[in-house]
Every structure is written in C-alpha cells, then in structure tokens.
C-alpha cells in the first residue's frame, strides 16, 4: 500500500510524555495511541505497547538516545509524540533538542506522587523552553481514596508553580493507561478527556515562518559586477527582496539591504524558512562578512558572549572525553555554523564534570555570537564533539 501523504490540513503539534521512571509514560503513550485509533480508525495507525516500548536507538550529534516517535490525530490536530523511556534518555533528549516539544504531558503516578525525577524533568522543561505542561495523574484506578488523589493533585500543582509553570490553571487529568489499554470504558474515557485537554490547552505553535527572519551564513563569495553573496539555510521567518537586514555576531553589527535572493540559480522575490538560498548584500565586500554570523531582521537578535547553559557531556563510549574537566576548561563552542572558544565556570559545589554527566555551567566566549535563550550548541575539542547544550540564560 502506498504511504499516505502528510496532509497539511490541521495544525501540527509536537508533544511528549515526561516524568519519573515507572510512572507509566510508555503505557500511557500506547493507551493514547490505541484509544485514538479506536475512536478515529481512519485517522490513526494501530501501534502496540511493545513497538513503543522497544524505543529504537538514535544518534543525535553523536549522542546515543533511546526514543520512540508515535504519530496520532484527534479531530482537531495532528500530533508527533516522543517518549524517552529512561531518565538519562529524557535528559539527553531535552538538552540536545533531539525532539523539540510544543507541550508535554507530565505523567505522575497517583500511587507515588511527584518524585525526585519528576522535579528534575519539570525544571529541565522550563530551562529548555517547553512552553506548556499539563498533568496525567496515572494509575488513578489504584487509589480508592478521593482525598488522597486531591492531595497528590495539589502537590503536583505546587511543583509546577514552583518551576514557573501555571500550576493553578494547568489541566490535571486522572487516568489509567493500563486500564485504558485493556479497554475498560471508564478509563478509555479518561484518556479521551486527557487528549481533549491537550487539544484545548496546549497552544498552537508559532510556525517558523511567522518568526523574525534569521539565516546563519555558511559561505560568502563575490559575484563580479553584482557584489557580495552570502549563502545558508533560512532558519526562520521570511525575507522579501529590498528588505533591510543586520549581520550579527563575531564583529560589530552591520546594517545592509538585500538586493537579490537566489535559490538553485533562480531569482526569488522572497526567502522562506527551511530554504537554502543566496542573498545579495548591498555595499558589503567579501571581507566584511564571514561564516558564523547571521543575517537577521533588524533588532530581532543581539550578540552576546556570556551565558548560563545546561549541558550533557558525552560518555567515553559515545566518543566523548575519557577524563573529567574542571572550571577554566577552554573548549570550542559550535553555534549554528562556527566554533568559538569559550571559558567554562562550573557552579559552586561542582568540582569537576565526568564524561556522561549533565551539568549547569557559565560560559564566557572570546567573540560574540547572535544568541537567545534556548539556542543549542555543541562543545568540541579539535573538531570532535564532546558535549551538547542549550543556553538557559544570557548574562551579557
């Protein structure tokens, strides 16, 4: 049978299950998949628990992550759902941005309440910029006492509020993934209610095209008689011909006008997010711009050198370092298209960082980079990736 074409008729939303190990993330993922298949068989594929549970190994920037991707649809939306079974997998996935989430379902077992990993996942979700969390109080079939459920719900709401999410308003839905998988009508309805809450409460993502224009420069060359052309893949936004732009990063910010846009040697009136294109820049010489800078809508992004980050350091088995590093370690930080040297300061109380650890750190780059919170980077030594991270806070 021919593979069905991806229909762009509905909003597409990336979502995931997060929370403590053994609280039932994978079972709930399978239950959502089954319940929606039973309700809308023409919109969904049949997926069983085993196929989701055997999360295949992926390599993202050299980091090994076990992760399952499940697709499903409600009447309103098309969802891509990621489930990272292990605690370490989840942390690597969040920090490396292997799967960007527009919202996440925090799974908390009603029998246990929030645990240490629950807290860590919520904190990390906030740091890497997951915009919205809602809660599935799983295994609710195993708690007979209504008051106990109320208490757990209160605890979860407090946890969300303490990490900067809307703990008062976030939906908390009492579900049982296992009972829903078994077809128990009461708990099947609970999963339907959960997805109705996801449909209603997770905001439609802002599409890349609607954001301010940004294109990292990959190459610069001169076209005789026409001027300087920079090439790259537009990361976001749209750019019309004759627009003013800024060139940001590495050197002082420069203003110029885009007088021509080309793709595959064809002239275009507009460049769109996701397209590889060449931009002809008025009045700039080849030596005025370089790889590693970005072409942006004026005023939309600024250059910075000092920032805080959350970082995962590759283990030896992943091809990372063989020994720990300390404060004042000076590797290269690879942002978008270029390496910049930076000096690391570890947080108070952290003596050293071992391969395979995740840590927070402060970094001072020797050259400014166009930066905003949530931006991902790789840490490299001599061209080899030894870590991956995201900017959590800009200092200067």
UniProtKB/Swiss-Prot annotation:
GTP binds at residues 19-26, 83-87, 138-141. It comes from the Bacteria. GO terms for molecular function: GTP binding; GTPase activity; translation elongation factor activity. It is an enzyme of class 3 (hydrolase). Residues 83-86 are annotated as: G3. Residues 19-26 are annotated as: G1. Residues 62-66 are annotated as: G2. Its EC number is 3.6.5.3. InterPro entries: EF-Tu_GTP-bd (IPR041709), EF-Tu_GTPase (IPR050055), EFTu-like_2 (IPR004161), EFTU_2 (IPR033720), G_TR_CS (IPR031157), P-loop_NTPase (IPR027417), Small_GTP-bd (IPR005225), T_Tr_GTP-bd_dom (IPR000795). Mg(2+) binds at residue 26. It catalyses: GTP + H2O = GDP + phosphate + H(+). Keywords: Cytoplasm, Elongation factor, GTP-binding, Hydrolase, Magnesium, Metal-binding, Nucleotide-binding, Protein biosynthesis. Residues 138-141 are annotated as: G4. It is found in: Cytoplasm. Residues 176-178 are annotated as: G5. Its main location: cytoplasm. It holds the Pfam family GTP_EFTU. Residues 10-206 form the tr-type G domain. One of its GO terms (cellular component) is cytosol. GTP hydrolase that promotes the GTP-dependent binding of aminoacyl-tRNA to the A-site of ribosomes during protein biosynthesis. Monomer. Belongs to the TRAFAC class translation factor GTPase superfamily. Classic translation factor GTPase family. EF-Tu/EF-1A subfamily. NCBIfam families: EF-Tu (TIGR00485), PRK00049.1 (NF000766), PRK12735.1 (NF009372), PRK12736.1 (NF009373), small_GTP (TIGR00231). This is Elongation factor Tu. The gene is tuf.
